[in-house]
Amino acid sequence: SEYIHIGGDEAGKASWPTCKLCQARMKKEGLKDVNELQSYLIHRIEVFLNAHGRKLLGWDEILEGGLAPNATVMSWRGTEGGMKAVDSGHMAIMSPGEFCYFDSYQDAPDSQPEAIGGYLPLAKVYSFNPVPDTLSADKVQLVYGVQANLFTEYIPTPEHAEMMIYPRILALAEVAWSDPSVKNYDDFHARALKEVEALKAEGYHPFDLKNEIGNRPGADQPIQHLAVGKKVTYGPDAAYYPGYSAGGDSALVDGVIGGWTYGDKRWQGFIDKKRMDVTIDMEKETEIHSVGADFMQVCGPEVFMPSEVIISVSNDGKEFTELKRMEHKVVKDDKVTFTNFGWEGNAKARYIRYQASSGEFGGFLFTDEIVEIGRASCR
C-alpha cells in the first residue's frame, strides 16, 4: 500500500509531564509541551515511512503539536481537523463519527441487534457535506475523499457486518461523488429500496430499509408545555457536563425531545457529584398536574438510569414540599432503554425542583426535557 495508517489517536498524555524519560526526550529535542512530544514521534515515523516509499496517514490527533511535513489527516472528531490540514496544504480524508461511524444503530435500538450506541440513520449519512461551501477551489482538491468506519466489538458475524454497512455505504458513496446541489434524499431513498432488494437477491444481508421505524417518537417536532422558556437554575455540585450541554441552561425547557442517542445534542448529561438538581421558575404561582422527565440507559458507555428521583415544589424557592420520591433499582443489561420518572396530581407552586441521583454503578445521567403540564396527564 502507498499509505500506511499509523493511528496516532487518543494517546493518553496524563503521565508524560512527570515521566522522566518523556521529560528527558523533550529537553533533548527542545520540545515545549507534551503535544510537541507526540508530534516528534509522528515526524520520526513519517521519515521512516517516506524512506521506504510509503506515505503517512493518521487520525486528526496528529495535528497536535505540529503536523508532519507530508502527512495526510483522517478527520474523525468532526471535520475541523480535516479543514486545518487542508488550510496548511495537506491532504485530508473526511470520516467524522457523526456521519461515518457505521457501528452506530441505524434504527430504533430495540429493533436492532446490540450496538456500541449512537444513532446514524440512512438520511443522516446522506445529509453529510464533507466540503464546506466556503472552501476555495484549490483547497477542495486537497479533500481526498470520505471514509466509513465499522468497528466490530459488537458485530460477531459477516452477515451482521453487511447489515450495518448496507445501505448506508450507498448513501456515503453518493455524498462522495455528488454535488450537494443535486442531492435529493427522496429520490435516493427510492433507489436505495430497490438496491436493498437487489443485494438480498445476491445473497447479502442488508438492513431492512422498507420497515425502518425512524427517529424516537416526538423527536421530530417541538412540544409545548407550561415550563417551555422558563428560567432554570442548577444546584451546587449538580451542573451539567459541558460536553453534553444540549444547548445550555435552557435545554431542559426548550420543547425539544431527544432522539435515540445521547450524542444528538438534545440530551443533557450529568456526572457531577450530586448528579442532577434542577429548579424551574414558573414566574408565578401555577396550577400543575404533572411533572416528568425521560432518562435513557446505555450500559456500554456507562449511561444509567437514576436510582432515585425527587420532585418537589415551592412558592419562595427556598422551602420545598416533596410531591413524589421514586426509588429505582438500576440493572445492567445490553439494551438501550428509556424510562419516564414523573408525578401526577394537583399542586400550586411557582418553583418546581427535579432531583435525580445515581446508584452503585455511577456513570452519567441523561435527560432531554422536564415536562410540566396543567392537565391530568403525563407524556
Question: How does the language model describe each region?
Answer:
Residues 1-69, 76-84:
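Active-site neighborhood of glycoside hydrolase catalytic domains
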Residues 6, 49, 73, 169, ...:
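Hydrophobic, well-ordered secondary-structure elements that form the walls
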Residues 16-18, 84-85, 104-105, 303-305, ...:
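Short, solvent-exposed loop/turn and secondary-structure capping segments
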Residues 20-29, 73, 108-111, 308, ...:
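Short secondary-structure boundary/capping segments
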Residues 55-61, 66-71, 76-222:
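Flexible, acidic glycine-rich loops studded with aromatic residues
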Residues 221-257:
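Predominantly extracellular/luminal regions of secreted and cell-surface proteins
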Residues 258-324, 335-377:
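Aromatic, loop-rich ligand-recognition surfaces of beta-strand-rich domains
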Residues 329-335:
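Short proline/glycine- and polar residue-rich coil/turn motifs
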